[in-house]
Amino acid sequence: MLAAEGIRYSYGKGAPVLDGVSLRVESGQRVALSAPSGTGKTTLARVLAGYLAPDEGRVTIDGRPLPRRGVCPVQMIWQHPEAAVDPRMRLGRTLAEAGPVDRALVGGLGIRDEWMDRFPHELSGGELQRFCIARALAAEPRFVIADEMSTMLDALTQAQIWRFLMDEVERREVGLVFVSHSPALTERIATDIVEL
């Protein structure tokens, strides 16, 4: 179980963006974070994935803190994939960061072999996001955090990416926490909704 208990987080000396936030996510559960824009959904996603340390509270998996070294069992798929990859690294190498390249994973996401030798700026946002999803899943996470991962993509690419991710998290019994401003997407995917 992924648990956040009493999370408080502030940027600098400002007012807390998160204050006393708690939630629990079981394996196989699909939780939507819901709140108006600017109220801490992305911040909470980053705290859950271990990218930000809370000012107060803690994040645990099965009662233990997230590991500080090695591959984290919580993987995040960012809204802007170009910010999640090294712009000077070819994408095949980026994908291999998570371990051996799983051909079924690559094929299922529609990643073409010729894209492996390209740099991030040479692909569209949808193509690049496919690499980010493949890298997150290749790490064999127990939980995936998806922060508006399809917002900037066309409707067809959104549908393909979400269908693939849903099949994978179900097959692997991975817990999913996602942020989306689409009520239709939330209704279709979420097993639970957490209001911040």
Question: What are these model-predicted stretches?
Answer:
Residues 1-4, 8-20, 27:
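A short, flexible loop at the N-terminus of ABC-type nucleotide-binding domains that lies
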Residues 49:
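Helix-to-loop junction immediately C-terminal to a conserved catalytic motif
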Residues 63-75, 83, 89, 93:
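ABC ATPase NBD coupling module
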Residues 80, 87-102:
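Q-loop/switch helix immediately C-terminal to the Walker
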Residues 119-123, 127:
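Conserved ABC ATPase signature
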Residues 133, 145, 161:
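Hydrophobic anchor residue at the start of the ABC signature
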Residues 140:
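Conserved catalytic motifs of ABC-family nucleotide-binding domains
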